[in-house]
Amino acid sequence: MAKTVQDILAIIEENDIKMVDFKMVDIHGQYRHVTIPAENFSEDTMKSGIGFDASNYGYAVVEKSDMVFIPDPDTAVVDPFCEIPTLSMTGNAMIIDSPENRPLAQYPRNIIQAAVQYMKDSGVADEMQILPEFEFYLFDDVTWQVEGRCVGATVDAKQSYWNSAVEGHGVVVPKQKNYHIAKPFDTSYECRSEMCLLMKEMGIDINYHHPEVAASGQYEIEPQLGEVVHMADATMMIKYIIHNTALKYGKSATFMPKPIYGEAGSGMHVHMLLFKDGEPVFSDDNGYSHLSETAHYFIGGLLKHIGSLCAITNPSTNSFKRLVPGFEAPVTVGYATSNRSAVIRIPAYAKSPNKRRFELRNPDATCNPYFCYAAILMAGLDGVKNRIDPHANGWGPYDMNLYKLPEEEKAKLQGLPVSLDEALDCLEKDHDYLTAGGVVPEALLKNFIAAKREECRQLSAIPHPAVFDKYYNL
């Protein structure tokens, strides 16, 4: 049941709340916030909103940057990281207009809601559920420096193999042998457990948490399936909880896809399924891997647009250092059951009709989740609309280890973009599926591409320490 203003006022009184914090997201997927004293919160706050400068969020030009933020009462939670009792809410950005404000089309939360409405209008489904997997590193120490005479970074995790020579330590994990390792080698169990308990308190149900492959402090937390807009909100809150809880334990968390060369990268695999009138759209006992024709067309849309999707689902230059062979990261455009070398995997363990689904394995958590999930939905719906058959297009199913194919066979396969610049090229050429129905504004795509091009330019101009190995003595 939806919360009302009276419900929020009751929460404020019951918890002796002193501050109300409004969390918004910028174009890159970073939380920003503005806070008001609790006594200033009223029904007018919910209607008129809180003013902010949208140009600093990447959504507007300076001369037309006044917007208002309208909180969504259903997102209200007590923030456990504030010493002063604080109620937190997220919501939507609106353009100031008369007689009524109207939604800011470029704001990512508005976009995912528009994508869901587009899905409903299409008649394909009335609900999308997703399950993003959160892989991340916890470091005990991290330093970096980017100056003219010094460019470098150093990380440390006490349980890592590189600390085997530290006197009196002894508890270390061999390289790439951290997966599901138990105590005493799992040195972050309490930290992750507290993260999950906090998520539960904030309305996010969890399946499990565990150590991931990389011995240098890599872990995973997996929530349960949930409605896509709720899970976009949850994605932001999960990252917020992980970052803040890590600091409490004297660690820092990073969702960088590839913080350490030679170690497993961190992704954010996204499982997905659709429902219509409460019935699973993707289930068919007679289909390949028990998936329906609609599910296969949805897969076809994802695979057709995977190049441009990568600009949104993997929007950092570091993202493409993860998408390389040898670390269970996808590099090939294709689908199959239980195959982690293809970009789409159908989990064999999802046997119940209400759980039959597939996962897109290339995304990572440097994305803006609202934009990411909306783009995934729009690509899939385009596949359904245009009946894009993944098998007929030569994208599988690939029921073999694609990493171990002979080179001449690998050469026949379509690969993912190898850089952010290449993915942005794809997005510039292929984005009509995103703008269909006015879901993603052209203006946002233009701003996003320009911002990411500038990132690529800046980072490519900085000499990497590894070039000294190659060129210093020539």
What does each model-identified segment do?
Residues 2-474:
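Glycine-rich, acidic/polar active-site loops that bind/position phosphate-bearing ligands
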